[in-house]
Amino acid sequence: MAIIHFTKVHGSQNDFFLVDEEENHITAWSDTKRADFAIKLCDRSHSLGGADGILYVAKSNKAGAIGQMRVVNSDGSIASMCGNGLRTVARYLLEKHALTDAKVETMKAILDVRKATSLGFDIPTYQVEISPVKFNPESLPMYVGVEKLFNQVIPELDEELAFSAVSVPNPHLITFVDQTVLDSDKQEKLASFLNSENPYFPDGVNVSFVKRLNEDAIYVRTFERGVGFTNACGTAMSACSLIKKMLDQDTLETPLNVYNDGGRVQVTAKKDETGDISLQLIGNATFVSTGSVRYDDIVTELTNEATVEQAQYQELVQEVKHFLKTTG
């Protein structure tokens, strides 16, 4: 039996339990045990309301990194990256170490994180690097008849929609659609198919449908691999922003407002001297509550104390809903 203390967090209402492995004395846990705990704690029928996954925070042995983030989805699978989750981990570690910027180790890269100017309503806001960005098949296993998929119709997937695929570093399949397609069940059917046994994306893929709102704003809805539909997916919003900029030949560094069912973020991009692209995701890092559970064969709630931050965030959500309603 173990008593586990947590912080319930969210980025764009993509919610997680943040668990500090060192403070909870669970650094020796196996991946199997981490997965089992995630499956049980993240169940939406649990008294704590469940979550999209667990963010395990640990010490890093990489030079310059102040900590390590490991993401386990609600189904027990491991996510190589989570942009919304990283913002909350960035806040947790920066506050813990009394810093305003640092580096955090993720599965595929050591990424820059920093405190940022609030996007509104004094909501705690953080900026995190999203990289590496790759289009090559080695980073994005797919069998759709092309090595690089950019704005192309793949009849096996859909007769009309043009798709792009990119890894950041988890895999994303992206298409731009109108409201009629958004209102249909096309995304759910396609994403469910591509995240079950299929000949096109053997490891599954995050599937995003994107609607243009204006020159400086898009709306993104994502079916996440291992989770399903979520309020928002940070890496998806970053990837969709990049594809939009490439399609429109926009300046990479210009901030793009990205709206989603969970709120709003901003994304910028840059290309270094070698041609490699990195993205910057800017958005909320909200701490919803702190509490503890007892973990043995089941996970039992012991304590759970709410903060005032979620009420604060709802002001932004109402602003977003009004914007989406009036923009159409």
UniProtKB/Swiss-Prot annotation:
Subcellular location, in the record's words?
Cytoplasm
- Site (Could be important to modulate the pK values of the two catalytic cysteine residues) residue list: 172, 224
- State any single GO MF term: diaminopimelate epimerase activity
Keywords, in A-Z order: Amino-acid biosynthesis, Cytoplasm, Isomerase, Lysine biosynthesis
Catalytic residues as annotated in Swiss-Prot or TrEMBL: 82 (proton donor), 233 (proton acceptor)
Q: Which domain of life is it from?
A: Bacteria
Any single GO BP term: lysine biosynthetic process via diaminopimelate
Binding positions (substrate): 14, 73, 83-84, 170, 206, 224-225, 234-235
GO CC: one term?
cytosol
Q: Tell me the HAMAP family matching this sequence.
A: DAP_epimerase
Q: What does this protein do?
A: Catalyzes the stereoinversion of LL-2,6-diaminopimelate (L,L-DAP) to meso-diaminopimelate (meso-DAP), a precursor of L-lysine and an essential component of the bacterial peptidoglycan.
Q: What protein family does this chain belong to?
A: Belongs to the diaminopimelate epimerase family.
Q: What is this protein called?
A: Diaminopimelate epimerase
